[in-house]
């Protein structure tokens, strides 16, 4: 495999009422053409016929991932110490020397996993990292790094024992009904904003289209703002290195840089939706080729006008000025000075102090806010390593890799024990990252 990081995708689901089931397995192998990778029940490892390099079990409180050390189907076993789970780089739980497998077992919230909330589903997203150690001669390596995204899907209304999941909710403000629900979400969208898109296959020079939303069961009129966004190499926005994309209560500061086109999209499709685009980037000096973006989303009543603390401002390079999505241009004046806090908080804070002070802040009942993480967004090391999505049989989706790239895409048909359901990677709704308040 040449010139890039391998990206594989796994998806695992639990269906309401299913207490346990045999985990689904996926096999893959190279068949002549080094770019012609395939997944499915008929694939065979060149080392061990019928072996499954990666198997996932989505259990009630944890996930269990088993990785065969012949990860690439070449007959060459990788070093178990080179495999880790999640952004926190958790080590394996056990080794099976007889079967040459490495097993990771971790709680659903452990090892830096990201949880997503959709109206019907809880989605836990993590990844397996393969970072090969140098060969005996430290100036060379013989295999490429690999990132294997993993998702576990659970019904939000019921758990696997058929007992209702009862999350704790907070009302929008004291005037709203206690039955109301606020669900904040970030979605990665296609170029025309019509559908969600996978998190893989981005290259430097591409654009990330991000859609922020808030929904309530009773549809109380709300206006959504993206207060701040920080990119990092993990879901922890406080980690280092980090990069501020949106700051100062809604100023898209990345668009102020000369070589970017980052901006909010005007007009909004709805008051409770806000879209913005950013130019793809990576962190210099880091070979992981991935980023997480943590955004602080908040809402105000729809009839409350924008102000310096509640705004969405982009920098217009042609006019050399900041412009708002709505409201008077005066609300954006503070974007240039960086002093957008109300008088009581007007002291100049560094970006991380501002970030920490805003987490889940409620301002006298006028706003409800939450931090939402989107990622990992995976970058292709090689130009042209973007797959094309096609529909496959039995509800599966097929990601067809471009010829000559190191990107491995998948076709998945998942069989759940006693349940006649098939699900696939990159289906609509599987790339949404949300937070419920």
Curated annotation (Swiss-Prot):
Result, substituting residue 340 to A: Abolishes secretion of processed zona pellucida sperm-binding protein 3
Outcome when changing residue 235 to D: Abolishes secretion of processed zona pellucida sperm-binding protein 3
GO cellular component terms given for this protein: apical part of cell; extracellular matrix; extracellular space; plasma membrane
GO biological process, one term: egg coat formation
Mutagenesis / variant outcome for changing residue 251 to A: Abolishes secretion of processed zona pellucida sperm-binding protein 3
Residue intervals passing through the bilayer: 406-426
Main location: membrane
Residue runs in coiled coils: none
Region (Extracellular hydrophobic patch): 368-380
Keyword Lyase: no
Gene3D superfamilies attached to this UniProt entry: Zona pellucida, ZP-C domain, Zona pellucida, ZP-N domain
Listed InterPro entries: ZP-C, ZP-C_dom, ZP-N, ZP_chr, ZP_dom, ZP_dom_CS
Location in the cell: Cell membrane
ZP domain residues: 57-320
UniProt topological domain (Cytoplasmic) ranges: 427-437
Prosegment residue ranges: 361-437
Secretion signal span: 1-20
Carbohydrate-modified residues: 159, 168
Tissue specificity of this protein: Detected in the ovarian perivitteline layer. Detected in granulosa cells in ovarian follicle (at protein level). Detected in granulosa cells in ovarian follicle.
Result for mutant: residue 152 to A: Abolishes secretion of processed zona pellucida sperm-binding protein 3
Modification note: Proteolytically cleaved before the transmembrane segment to yield the secreted ectodomain incorporated in the zona pellucida.
GO MF annotation: an example: identical protein binding
Subunit structure: Homodimer. Forms higher oligomers, once its C-terminus has been proteolytically removed. Forms heterooligomers with other zona pellucida glycoproteins.
Entry's free-text remark on domains: The ZP domain is involved in the polymerization of the ZP proteins to form the zona pellucida.
Protein name: Zona pellucida sperm-binding protein 3
